[in-house]
């Protein structure tokens, strides 16, 4: 999350320009000076169509789609169950090609409509998390590897599945490097955001004079649960060695890993509250209309959920967390590392949220 900055300043400055590499001391990769494409400033979280949710998302989607001709729309609109929907990735665009229409292909008005759609489709916290990921990508754009890997905040893509409708199911996907949101809407309401990936590299950085901490609050919320456990509970919660990556990321639809860790049934009420607070960091990315229902469902199955943890509270160190129950898988992985051109460019996170029973709203 961002630190010590008002929302107006945060979004106005987010990626108004990519940093000129000469404006910061070359620390991490000794990147040369690059010329960067200017971006339209990302607007504040604004809800021109009413409270965020299925109804507002429908209006915003139709307003966005109305700016395209039929030929162009065919490039980013697919059947509800199209195979393309499951072919998303968290890797840089220089490694994995994307489908959909990118931020870089949009006119100024279309970009405005895009951000209004995202605001109408996500909670304020969810919108902020998307902006933080894009800010990290702008930070990476100063790195010497940026051209090859296509680290560029214009390289995020939107696609639709099914035709946005008040009485038929449809969904949308927005993603790129370290981001893959998949929300499903039916009957005018958001039904699920499974699967959704939120990550960042770096996690702690300064962009255009604004300090960011992206995904760090998720890490700290998980560690707060672990720190509340007694010695026996911590031993039971031990996740073992930190894996190379999360187990249920892109390309792992339908895979349910074995249960590991401490059963929540053995936790105190205070510990359960901390666990629910950690879970909410992911669930509340989606609008309140579904997040509240989802948290109620999770609380009802709380004693069937397990919590596993390895690592500490340091942003720049190896950490792995898994929270898993009948309808829930959350994973967080921290590998650490320094990137970009600033000493504040620390940390590297991958996280995933899944409801194995409602993937893509099915």
Predicted segment positions?
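Bacterial N-terminal signal peptides that target proteins for export
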Residues: 2-13
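Bacterial N-terminal signal peptides
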Residues: 12-22
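Sec/Tat signal peptide C-region and signal peptidase I cleavage site
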Residues: 24-28
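A cross-kingdom marker for long, charged
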Residues: 29-123, 127-362
């Amino acid at each position: 999350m961002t630190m010590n900055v008002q929302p107006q300043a945060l979004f106005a400055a987010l990626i108004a320009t990519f940093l000129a590499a000469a404006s910061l001391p070359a620390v991490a990769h000794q990147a040369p000076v690059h010329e960067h494409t200017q971006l339209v400033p990302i607007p504040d979280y604004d809800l021109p169509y009413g409270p965020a949710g299925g109804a507002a998302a429908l209006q915003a989607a139709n307003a966005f789609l109305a700016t395209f001709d039929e030929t162009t729309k065919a490039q980013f609109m697919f059947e509800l169950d199209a195979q393309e929907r499951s072919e998303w990735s968290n890797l840089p665009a220089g490694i994995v090609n994307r489908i959909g229409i990118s931020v870089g292909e949009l006119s100024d008005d279309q970009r405005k409509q895009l951000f209004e759609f995202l605001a109408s489709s996500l909670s304020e916290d969810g919108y902020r998390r998307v902006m933080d990921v894009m800010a990290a990508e702008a930070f990476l754009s100063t790195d010497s590897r940026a051209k090859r890997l296509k680290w560029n905040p214009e390289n995020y893509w939107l696609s639709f599945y099914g035709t946005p409708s008040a009485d038929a199911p449809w969904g949308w996907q927005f993603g790129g490097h370290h981001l893959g949101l998949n929300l499903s809407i039916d009957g005018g309401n958001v039904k699920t955001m499974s699967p959704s990936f939120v990550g960042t590299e770096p996690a702690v950085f300064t962009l255009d004079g604004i300090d960011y901490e992206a995904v760090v609050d998720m890490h700290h919320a998980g560690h707060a649960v672990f720190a509340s456990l007694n010695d026996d509970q911590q031993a039971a919660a031990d996740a073992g060695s930190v894996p190379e990556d999360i187990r249920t990321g892109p390309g792992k639809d339908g895979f349910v890993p074995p249960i590991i860790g401490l059963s929540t049934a053995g936790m105190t009420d205070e510990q359960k509250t901390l666990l629910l607070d950690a879970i909410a960091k992911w669930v509340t990315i989606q609008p309140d209309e579904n997040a509240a229902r989802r948290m109620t469902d999770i609380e009802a199955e709380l004693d069937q959920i397990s919590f596993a943890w390895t690592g500490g509270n340091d942003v720049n160190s190896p950490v792995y967390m898994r929270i898993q129950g009948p309808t829930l898988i959350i994973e967080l992985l921290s590998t650490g590392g320094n990137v970009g051109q600033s000493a504040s460019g620390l940390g590297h996170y991958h996280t995933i949220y899944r409801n194995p029973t409602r993937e893509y709203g099915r």
